[in-house]
A protein has these predicted regions:
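N-terminal cap/lid segment of alpha/beta-hydrolase-fold proteins
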Residues: 14-55, 297-300
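Alpha/beta-hydrolase-fold enzymes
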Residues: 132-230
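Catalytic nucleophile-loop/oxyanion-hole region of alpha/beta-hydrolase
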Residues: 96-132
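Short beta-strand/loop motif that positions the catalytic acidic residue
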Residues: 252, 258-260, 264
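Short beta-strand element of the alpha/beta-hydrolase
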Residues: 58-66
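Conserved alpha/beta-hydrolase
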Residues: 72, 80-104
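Catalytic histidine-centered segment of alpha/beta-hydrolase-like enzymes
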Residues: 291-304
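The serine-hydrolase catalytic nucleophile loop
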Residues: 69-81, 269-270, 299
Length: 316
């Protein structure tokens, strides 16, 4: 039942999915956001740097960025700005090794690492009456998985969730990213991920074989040799199987909106959970014809998807 219609119509040039995706990431200009950084210590003696916009509101939105993003990502900054202007406090996560400083432990972030999201929720829990989770791409997978996988008891203070451009089937998305038209995206990810692995190897020289980087040609290769092994999975296949959020969507009990553009170059057909939305009373799906990956460009300071986030949170 909750498959929602949408009114997204991009400016003419941005009907091309790669332009919508690339412009949003590389060329968008956003108004300054003044965050206050706080460091959270984790149970395994590591840390998370969280950037806050705090006001008198008793409502807070936790923002979860995508692969190799941070609180500096344009979509995080714009969403934080819009939400704060409309009465919400904001906590923008920086995952492990994403705040500009290497984390202490061998483990890093990944698409299924919901324990770190849980730590941030517990940190803000005493000070707010209503908590909302918003995730983009990998961060959206975290939000959906956290709400559906029953590893953690969900606080009654969590009121609603929004996820944007989410590879809910990680294996399907990894195959889509291997298409030749997506080479630029994969190259950009692998460039920064490889640099991080060199720093990790300097920190933990006996824990993995850095020479495997020479074999890495795709993100799947990287996940096979590094992401999976460092974070306790057998291989990329095991990681994708266990961390994909699609399998957990039927268990979601809070109002949750997923917006995936039909022309998203990162997504396979399996990343559009139509059946799950049809069978759910809490999970809402929007599939605009255009939008690219975390694009949804529109005129003005804020993008169409950011207004959808605000509208959904306001209603819940």
């Amino acid at each position: 039942m909750p498959i929602l219609s949408n009114d997204y119509k991009p400016p003419f040039l941005f009907k091309y999915r790669h332009i919508n995706t690339i412009y949003s990431s590389l060329f968008r200009k956003t108004k300054p956001v003044f965050f206050k950084r706080k460091r959270i210590e984790t149970l395994d003696d590591d840390f998370l740097d969280i950037d806050f916009i705090e006001n008198s509101s008793k409502k807070i939105v936790i923002l979860c960025h995508g692969l190799e993003g941070s609180s500096d990502s344009k979509y995080i900054q714009a969403t934080a700005k819009l939400l704060s202007l409309n009465g919400y406090s904001v906590a923008a996560m920086n995952y492990r090794f994403c705040s500009g400083e290497i984390n202490r432990q061998l483990v890093t972030y990944h698409s299924g690492k919901t324990d770190d999201l849980h730590a941030v929720i517990n940190y803000v829990l005493p000070n707010y009456e209503s908590i909302y989770l918003v995730g983009f791409s990998l961060g959206g997978n975290l939000v959906l998985k956290y709400n559906g996988d029953s590893l953690f008891s969900l606080s009654s203070k969590i009121k609603a969730n929004v996820a944007i451009s989410v590879p809910v089937d990680l294996k399907g998305s990894s195959i889509a990213l291997r298409r030749s038209e997506n080479t630029l995206y994969s190259w950009r990810f692998l460039r920064t991920l490889s640099k991080k692995m060199h720093l990790k190897h300097h920190q933990f020289p006996k824990n993995f074989d850095i020479r495997q980087l020479k074999k890495v040609k795709t993100l799947t290769d990287f996940d096979d040799y590094f992401t999976s092994k460092i974070n306790g999975f057998e291989d990329a296949e095991d990681y994708y199987l266990k961390a994909s959020s699609k399998q957990f969507i039927p268990n979601i009990s809070k109002p949750t909106l997923l917006i995936n553009a039909l022309d998203d170059p990162f997504l396979s057909e399996s990343c559009f959970p139509v059946r799950e939305a049809n069978e759910s009373s809490n999970f809402y799906l929007m599939t605009p014809l255009h939008g690219g990956h975390v694009g949804f460009i529109s005129k003005g300071d804020f993008y169409w998807s950011e207004y959808q986030i605000l509208n959904f949170l306001d209603r819940n």
